[in-house]
């Protein structure tokens, strides 16, 4: 099986009317794939691309009006296309000459083509000499020169065109062995996802591919979840703690007790709705807002340990198999034993990944030795006697055990939605959330590279949409509870001096465009951005029968996202960890 190779882009530069399009069409032959310039950008100075062969793309750009320098810096191979001797336009403008000399200085292969006008075939030798002298005077004499006749594209045999084709293929094959493999960095994309993106592109073009990736990103954690927080007092206090809000914040529960079920969508995930449900004398009026007949899960809030009468009040609000859990606001007691067992197992598995007991603990089963010691009568009694729902004490640091318990008790889709909707309340919760974000990071990375391709400008920013990455990083920073307001809220809850927890963070915020660009440049490395812009779409073509998934845009975006997420996770673990003794 041949080793994967990189994609090579040869850019044809020349004045308008110099014959670039006809030359590329002749080199590509019939039935070629073309990357069209986006609507409304035909005169914007953006190259169009054609797939000439597996891993070889030919682009053309008229200079003027476009400035050749920035695009020439993106090409793996540069071809100067000079017009015939007729006309008043100079065949080699100063800008073209400067771009070509800069390419040679960078080590970019350079070729030159002089297209003859109709009737100039008899003067081919003279045209070759004149063009060679022109190139020598411009410091470009090292470039191989080709002088095809005017009717070369329509003839079956054209030695000069064939010679140019051989040189192009030879140069491309040499470069393909040096460039990163086309699919390098896309290992996280499964074959099904990659095929779906390509199918969307082939069906509806770049916009369809963008829509497919964007829709998949929006579906992450999009399951509907209606979570009731019911009680006679302090219902709003528990709701605000779960959402990471202070009283008076937008979206927080009002100070007055609710008189009927009231919805509070999670700020970042409106598909997750927390409902305050008053019980007893506080429910004084019929519900005005339509609400579920049965909630997906319910949290019973009581001042102390809930009684059987308290549980009886809320059982009709959920289906028999729905999660039911309690919170006591006096802070007394401990987390349920199964949650404590799971935390111990998780800590052990963090230190020793081979500890097979962690799975049993995770399910709340307990040690097998305890099970073996029980008598048949004990086992029968456990089956007949229904255990009461677990109860969590409310502490200043939040309710981390409650969130973990709910995520285990809910169906997978709703558990994922809840994980992404609520801010983490412990280092372990932050690690779980970061793992979920990391698993889906390929979607915003791919969206950033495709979105940039829809509105290209030369340079690394073309291959990767900086604004989209900036927004994604800012969203993740909020999701992990690293906004200054969230950090200050935790400092107040723990009775710490202002700024104590903020000093533990290292990830810069707010996320600026300059910060994202610096990270992209640092990740890509100096001198490796050549071809990034022109190859950003190349992953949509088959290469050698395999998926060609190249483009520095995706690899840089994915690398920057994962690196930043690791830094944010370290900050979240530091902020959510126990305070130091001297604080």
Curated annotation (Swiss-Prot):
Limits of the IRG-type G domain: 223-409
Family annotation (InterPro entries): G_IRG_dom, IRGQ
Segments carrying motif LIR 2: 381-384
Localization: Lysosome; Cytoplasmic vesicle, Autophagosome
Renumbered ranges of motif LIR 1: 186-189
UniProt entry keywords in alphabetical sequence: Autophagy, Coiled coil, Cytoplasmic vesicle, Disulfide bond, Isopeptide bond, Lysosome, Phosphoprotein
Region ranges (Disordered): 322-373
Residue list for modification Phosphothreonine: 203
Biased composition (Acidic residues): 332-341
GO biological process: positive regulation of autophagy; protein quality control for misfolded or incompletely synthesized proteins; substrate localization to autophagosome
A GO-annotated cellular component: lysosome
Coiled coil start-end: 155-179
Comment field on protein domains: The LIR motifs (LC3-interacting region) are required for the interaction with ATG8 family proteins GABARAPL2 and MAP1LC3B/LC3B.
Summary of subunit composition and partner proteins: Interacts (via LIR motif 1) with GABARAPL2. Interacts (via LIR motif 2) with MAP1LC3B/LC3B.
Family the UniProt entry places it in: Belongs to the TRAFAC class dynamin-like GTPase superfamily. IRG family.
Protein name: Immunity-related GTPase family Q protein
Gene assigned in the entry: Irgq
